[in-house]
């Protein structure tokens, strides 16, 4: 089994903020598959089981995401872990896959690294960098950013669908990594 985690913050206050990119992408994937999440008090997370994947949205707030991830990882005895998260070091429209590495100051990744190690797969979704990091990651996308954000999130969702079908991280990485922002037509 593979644990596929979308990072974000719970509550309506944070809906569709930059920091909730992981939640939004998993929500879109689950909706397209005509599935739904159920809340698991045991893992303090929303869960969805599809094929041999556990899709997880921790409800602990970002800084404690590792608690939900570790709980589900141990309970389901998953062999692989893929984290979908926002990355302010990448421009909006860039989507990158990688295995392992540092947390780049991302508090959700820090929490997961501390409890689970840092040798997991990552789907990094660019949100660009703002002047005030905290305000920026907790802000919603501007209207003029929406088309590019939507295209990048759609690309990320399609990458996850490919990964679920192929079970091949390297093929997914090679096929779906975008080193430059997507080009969208106006």
From Swiss-Prot:
Discriminates between blocked and unblocked aminoacyl-tRNA (site feature) positions: 9
EC number: 3.1.1.29
A single MF term (Gene Ontology): peptidyl-tRNA hydrolase activity
GO biological process: protein quality control for misfolded or incompletely synthesized proteins; rescue of stalled ribosome
Subcellular location: Cytoplasm
Keyword Membrane: no
Active site: 19 (proton acceptor)
Catalytic activity: an N-acyl-L-alpha-aminoacyl-tRNA + H2O = an N-acyl-L-amino acid + a tRNA + H(+)
This protein's record includes keyword tRNA-binding: yes
One cellular-component annotation, GO: cytoplasm
Stabilizes the basic form of H active site to accept a proton, annotated site positions: 86
Keywords of the record: Cytoplasm, Hydrolase, RNA-binding, tRNA-binding
Residues annotated as binding tRNA: 14, 61, 63, 107
Top EC class for this record: hydrolase
Organism domain of life: Bacteria
Subunit details: Monomer.
Family, as annotated: Belongs to the PTH family.
Function: Hydrolyzes ribosome-free peptidyl-tRNAs (with 1 or more amino acids incorporated), which drop off the ribosome during protein synthesis, or as a result of ribosome stalling.
PANTHER family: PEPTIDYL-TRNA HYDROLASE
Record's protein name: Peptidyl-tRNA hydrolase
Organism this protein belongs to: Helicobacter pylori (strain J99 / ATCC 700824) (Campylobacter pylori J99)
Recorded name of the encoding gene: pth
